[in-house]
A protein has these predicted regions:
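Short amphipathic alpha-helix adjacent to the substrate-entry channel of hydrolases
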Residues: 90-111
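Structural signature of beta-strand start/N-cap positions in the alpha/beta core
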Residues: 76, 105-107, 148
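A glycine/proline-hinged amphipathic helix-loop "lid/cap" segment
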Residues: 1-66
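Short beta-to-alpha linker loops that shape the active-site pocket of alpha/beta-hydrolase fold enzymes
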Residues: 112-116
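Primarily recognizes the serine-hydrolase "nucleophile elbow" in alpha/beta-hydrolase
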Residues: 130-171
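Short beta-strand element of the alpha/beta-hydrolase
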Residues: 74-83
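Conserved catalytic-core motifs of eukaryotic protein kinase domains, centered on the activation segment
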Residues: 89-91, 119-121
Length: 171
């Protein structure tokens, strides 16, 4: 299978550094290793503006990052990162979010939902749905007043995006 240069570089670096299998590590260690891997990757486009904020959820709050492209945005995208429900955060996925903002011409709001095992199901789903509701009601804060709203994600985040879209349709 053909892999792009960034993926090939990341895999070579992991092999060279003998990166452990994340599934064999306790969650805290897996999170640290995953973050180290991501810090070694090239950053995303720097012409994308970044602003962090807090979203209230179920008596707590979660972080979110608003990424605004230099060009005029055509949509407001809420993005849920992957990580097997256990690892990953908006810092680890910053480059991904920046690329999405630029290439999709979207204001991207990355949501740092709470993760297992500390926060088991349905906490991540509820966090993401609360984030969707908050972002929709506070479009002026995130900069997407008149833009169509879409949800997206990768891996566990793709699952969350699907569940949230269905729940929003049904409620």
């Amino acid at each position: 299978m053909h892999l792009d240069l960034a993926t090939t570089s990341m895999l070579a670096g992991m092999a060279l550094n003998e990166t452990p299998d994340l599934s064999t590590l306790p969650p805290d260690e897996a999170r640290l290793v995953f973050s180290e891997i991501n810090r070694s990757m090239p950053p995303g486009p720097q012409n994308v503006a970044s602003n962090d904020l807090e979203i209230p959820v179920d008596g707590a709050s979660i972080r979110a990052r608003v990424l605004t492209p230099a060009a005029s945005a055509k949509r407001l995208m809420i993005y849920f990162h992957g990580g097997g429900w256990v690892i990953g955060n908006i810092d680890d996925y910053d480059a991904v979010g920046r690329h999405l903002a630029e290439t999709c011409q979207s204001v991207v709001v990355m949501v740092d939902y709470r993760k297992a095992p500390e926060h088991p199901f349905p906490t991540p789903v509820n966090d993401c749905y609360s984030a969707l509701e908050w972002i929709d009601k506070n479009r002026s804060i995130v900069g997407g007043d008149a833009l169509p709203l879409v949800v997206a994600g990768d891996s566990a985040g793709g699952n969350l995006a699907t569940v949230i879209a269905i729940r929003a349709r049904d409620e």
